[in-house]
Amino acid sequence: MFYPEQFDVIIIGGGHAGTEAAMAAARMGRQTLLLTHNIDTLGQMSCNPAIGGIGKGHLVKEIDALGGLMATAIDHAGIQFRILNASKGPAVRATRAQADRVLYRQAVRTALENQPNLMIFQQPVEDLIVENDRVVGAVTQMGLKFRAKAVVLTVGTFLDGKIHIGLENYSGGRAGDPPSISLSQRLRELPLRVNRLKTGTPPRIDARSIDFSVLAPQHGDTPIPVFSFMGNAGQHPEQMACYITYTNEKTHDVIRNNLDRSPMYAGIIEGIGPRYCPSIEDKVMRFADRNAHQIFLEPEGLTSNEIYPNGISTSLPFDVQMQIVRSMEGMQNARIIRPGYAIEYDFFDPRDLKPTLESKFIQGLFFAGQINGTTGYEEAAAQGLLAGLNAGRYANEDEGWSPRRDQAYLGVLVDDLSTLGTKEPYRMFTSRAEYRLMLREDNADLRLTEKGRELGLVDDARWARFSEKLEHIEQERQRLRDIWMHPHAENVEQVNALLKAPLSREANGEELLRRPEMDYTQLTSVAAFAPPLADTQAAEQVEIQVKYEGYIARQQEEIEKQQRNENTVLPLDLDYQQVSGLSNEVIAKLNDHKPNSIGQASRISGITPAAISILLIWLKKQGLLRRSA
């Protein structure tokens, strides 16, 4: 039977991608349905209890700048906050938080259940309703049919999921959850390229069985960082320490002696695992010269005895897992309460997607998260937000939107996936972005909140705070420009005490702040430049904008040059066989990738500058040379 109500957007899956997609579509005013196999696992952290990190924290800030959920949820659930790369430049500084799993899940579910225009329904989805290459709905396990104008697939590792522990394996979406077999088979019938990937998780340890007295603690930062631009440290729950231990030669011997019992080394697992989060078996074999690997013992929550040993993901048999765990310092009597495992699952080639994350072959069908070949909560959530907002725009017959590479790490992520695809689980790093200086955590709102408001994602409270911050930044920069200090002024000694060499010429506040030895706090401690801004976010922006002004201006020039190619549109139905002068290799790659723009085409491996020139000349001759806004 058909459900009596028709929806604008259906989201299939309630993980990190699905929850952000559902919130985004609903915030835009679209009637949204979130279908999940279990309402109690909405926002579940299936692997590590943490949010953020290098590159990942940048994505979380961007999600927040666009009105998303993840940063707010972790501010209410984070039990340890740290700034990584704090001693380095602002472009690569990143926030990371340990999470209380229960509090995080509660924060996500509360937000979903209080979001207008959003309905949640518990039923596994087994089929899509596709008519004339357009998706128009979904069918659940009980045969209930839901109609919608757009559908977003955010099914994580559930598609034909297979869990491996040693040489034994069984079907599962993750430990304790069934896989999605019927939907996987249905999707394989569509004109989409599909492959298999693998990921894994470590065994969980009973904290009461660990001797923490012999281990080094790792505490969070003081003052405690905050993730959301709308957040404050008062929202954080009680803070906890992590602890550090190490593998050793005994650990490595156990692993080497049991490789024949590893499903990966025995050839049972076909899927490729994440390069930057390898299993402990992989680490020991790939880095044979290392006699120890650092392992972080991370608490899973304030009310839980579970410890997540970050760094020993494994699919070795349980008896070997016990030997590995007990070989490490402080863990000699450790008890495993959940075994580690590897999971294989279907993913679909993201080169078959537009930059909006809509399928090139099935209209109205969007993909987000691990189904696109990514790994990580943050990567999934960022894609979910983008897919949800574009599904909402599609349902309203509006043009889709995707950020450029110079606008957001989300733009880098989507461009990498849709242009290059991936053969292994894709993880975000700051090194993937050409314009890192522009794409900092601290300015995510300055880059994206205005666009989020235009798209209908940003509410009045966030917009008011953002507008106030902009005003504070401009007013403070103008104030500093207007205050001058002369070498012979009465209070010049206060300034000279902060400088490497005494002031030799008249300088205003911005010029003094630009000096490497001067920071904003020091400058505003001088009576002439006091008082400092009470708005600490705005104060941080003032310092960064002033100190890096020259570098930022140069990077902006590079972006403007590149933008010409990015804005030159390529028709998706163009047959590159028609373009005389292109080599067979180039023709094959362009027909395979179907790039959206000259800029995207230029990033495809094997596409030469000469080929781009030929293409531009041909487009001009054919009257097809046009640039998007």
UniProtKB/Swiss-Prot annotation:
<dbReference type="Pfam" id="PF13932">
    <property type="entry name" value="SAM_GIDA_C"/>
</dbReference>
<feature type="binding site">
    <location>
        <begin position="273"/>
        <end position="287"/>
    </location>
    <ligand>
        <name>NAD(+)</name>
    </ligand>
</feature>
<dbReference type="InterPro" id="IPR004416">
    <property type="entry name" value="MnmG"/>
</dbReference>
<feature type="binding site">
    <location>
        <position position="180"/>
    </location>
    <ligand>
        <name>FAD</name>
    </ligand>
</feature>
<dbReference type="InterPro" id="IPR047001">
    <property type="entry name" value="MnmG_C_subdom"/>
</dbReference>
<dbReference type="GO" id="GO:0050660">
    <property type="term" value="F:flavin adenine dinucleotide binding"/>
</dbReference>
<dbReference type="GO" id="GO:0005829">
    <property type="term" value="C:cytosol"/>
</dbReference>
<keyword id="KW-0963">Cytoplasm</keyword>
<feature type="binding site">
    <location>
        <position position="370"/>
    </location>
    <ligand>
        <name>FAD</name>
    </ligand>
</feature>
<dbReference type="GO" id="GO:0002098">
    <property type="term" value="P:tRNA wobble uridine modification"/>
</dbReference>
<protein>
    <recommendedName>
        <fullName>tRNA uridine 5-carboxymethylaminomethyl modification enzyme MnmG</fullName>
    </recommendedName>
</protein>
<comment type="similarity">
    <text>Belongs to the MnmG family.</text>
</comment>
<dbReference type="GO" id="GO:0030488">
    <property type="term" value="P:tRNA methylation"/>
</dbReference>
<keyword id="KW-0285">Flavoprotein</keyword>
<feature type="binding site">
    <location>
        <position position="125"/>
    </location>
    <ligand>
        <name>FAD</name>
    </ligand>
</feature>
<dbReference type="InterPro" id="IPR040131">
    <property type="entry name" value="MnmG_N"/>
</dbReference>
<keyword id="KW-0520">NAD</keyword>
<keyword id="KW-0274">FAD</keyword>
<comment type="function">
    <text>NAD-binding protein involved in the addition of a carboxymethylaminomethyl (cmnm) group at the wobble position (U34) of certain tRNAs, forming tRNA-cmnm(5)s(2)U34.</text>
</comment>
<dbReference type="InterPro" id="IPR044920">
    <property type="entry name" value="MnmG_C_subdom_sf"/>
</dbReference>
<dbReference type="InterPro" id="IPR049312">
    <property type="entry name" value="GIDA_C_N"/>
</dbReference>
<dbReference type="InterPro" id="IPR002218">
    <property type="entry name" value="MnmG-rel"/>
</dbReference>
<dbReference type="InterPro" id="IPR020595">
    <property type="entry name" value="MnmG-rel_CS"/>
</dbReference>
<dbReference type="Pfam" id="PF21680">
    <property type="entry name" value="GIDA_C_1st"/>
</dbReference>
<comment type="subunit">
    <text>Homodimer. Heterotetramer of two MnmE and two MnmG subunits.</text>
</comment>
<dbReference type="InterPro" id="IPR026904">
    <property type="entry name" value="MnmG_C"/>
</dbReference>
<feature type="binding site">
    <location>
        <begin position="13"/>
        <end position="18"/>
    </location>
    <ligand>
        <name>FAD</name>
    </ligand>
</feature>
<keyword id="KW-0819">tRNA processing</keyword>
<dbReference type="InterPro" id="IPR036188">
    <property type="entry name" value="FAD/NAD-bd_sf"/>
</dbReference>
<dbReference type="Pfam" id="PF01134">
    <property type="entry name" value="GIDA"/>
</dbReference>
